[in-house]
Amino acid sequence: MIIPIRCFTCGKVIGNKWESYLGLLQAEYTEGDALDALGLKRYCCRRMLLGHVDLIEKLLNYAPLEK
């Protein structure tokens, strides 16, 4: 869905790092190197980006108000 603004465990702001993370992955960084470059050292914050599935574009195809 939408990337969480803060880490669920420690509360660090991570929402502003999603676009940068995707850019680093496009630039052939590994997942671990991209997270290190963004300054995400705690495993709780790292899992927030690694485990995120971006489904918002797919869900917009199923607007319930349109008939």
Curated annotation (Swiss-Prot):
Residue pairs linked by disulfide bridges in the UniProt entry: none
Q: Which organism is it from?
A: Drosophila melanogaster (Fruit fly)
Q: Where in the cell is it found?
A: Nucleus
Quaternary assembly: Component of the RNA polymerase I (Pol I), RNA polymerase II (Pol II) and RNA polymerase III (Pol III) complexes consisting of at least 13, 12 and 17 subunits, respectively.
Its GO biological process annotations read: transcription by RNA polymerase I; transcription by RNA polymerase II; tRNA transcription by RNA polymerase III
**Entry function:** DNA-dependent RNA polymerase catalyzes the transcription of DNA into RNA using the four ribonucleoside triphosphates as substrates. Common component of RNA polymerases I, II and III which synthesize ribosomal RNA precursors, mRNA precursors and many functional non-coding RNAs, and a small RNAs, such as 5S rRNA and tRNAs, respectively. Pol II is the central component of the basal RNA polymerase II transcription machinery. Pols are composed of mobile elements that move relative to each other. In Pol II, Polr2L is part of the core element with the central large cleft.
Q: What family does the Swiss-Prot or TrEMBL record give for this protein? A: Belongs to the archaeal Rpo10/eukaryotic RPB10 RNA polymerase subunit family.
Q: Which PANTHER family match?
A: DNA-DIRECTED RNA POLYMERASES I, II, AND III SUBUNIT RPABC5, DNA-DIRECTED RNA POLYMERASES I, II, AND III SUBUNIT RPABC5 FAMILY MEMBER
Q: Which GO terms describe its molecular function?
A: DNA binding; DNA-directed RNA polymerase activity; zinc ion binding
Iron found in the keyword field:
no
Gene Ontology annotations for the cellular component aspect, listed alphabetically? RNA polymerase I complex; RNA polymerase II, core complex; RNA polymerase III complex
The protein here is known as DNA-directed RNA polymerases I, II, and III subunit RPABC5
Alphabetically list the UniProt keywords. DNA-directed RNA polymerase, Metal-binding, Nucleus, Transcription, Zinc
The UniProt annotation places Zn(2+) binding at C7, C10, C44, C45
